[in-house]
């Protein structure tokens, strides 16, 4: 390995890990972990019919985490990433809420009840993600100058 490659490796590592320290990075990582735990709970139950939601949301969150971590979202400009992330988290919020209510009403088996309760927690987590990534909320307008610009 050349000296220039060795010197650029820490910078590359720093660039790749800097997103994981942000609020959005921690939130995406928490979504992946929570989806994995819900998937395990649904798989441990007698019927794993609801596990597909956890798999799909875990994959979507992991893809977005990789795109944001590697800064690929700035290189692929034909996708509107804030709206994509907002709709992903909004749809996940709605689907986890419906699935959790159905699972808790059925209430067969302790692992399904735990998965339903964790699904409600995932509803809150994805809802918070949708709230902080709402694109229109992030647009800031500069205040109009009130002082004349041509002197006193």
From Swiss-Prot:
InterPro entries in the record: Marvel (IPR008253), MARVEL-CKLF_proteins (IPR050578)
Membrane-spanning segments: 25-45, 48-68, 85-105, 112-132
Protein location: Membrane
Any one GO molecular-function label of the UniProt entry: chemokine binding
PROSITE patterns, alphabetized: MARVEL (PS51225)
UniProt KW Lipid biosynthesis keyword: no
Membrane-related topology note: Multi-pass membrane protein
Any Pfam family matching the protein: MARVEL
Principal cellular location given in the protein's record: membrane
Domain called MARVEL: residue spans: 19-138
Gene Ontology CC terms: plasma membrane
Signal peptide: none
Keyword Transmembrane helix (UniProt): yes
Keyword set, alphabetical order: Membrane, Transmembrane, Transmembrane helix
Function: May play a role in cell differentiation in the intestinal epithelium.
Protein name: Proteolipid protein 2
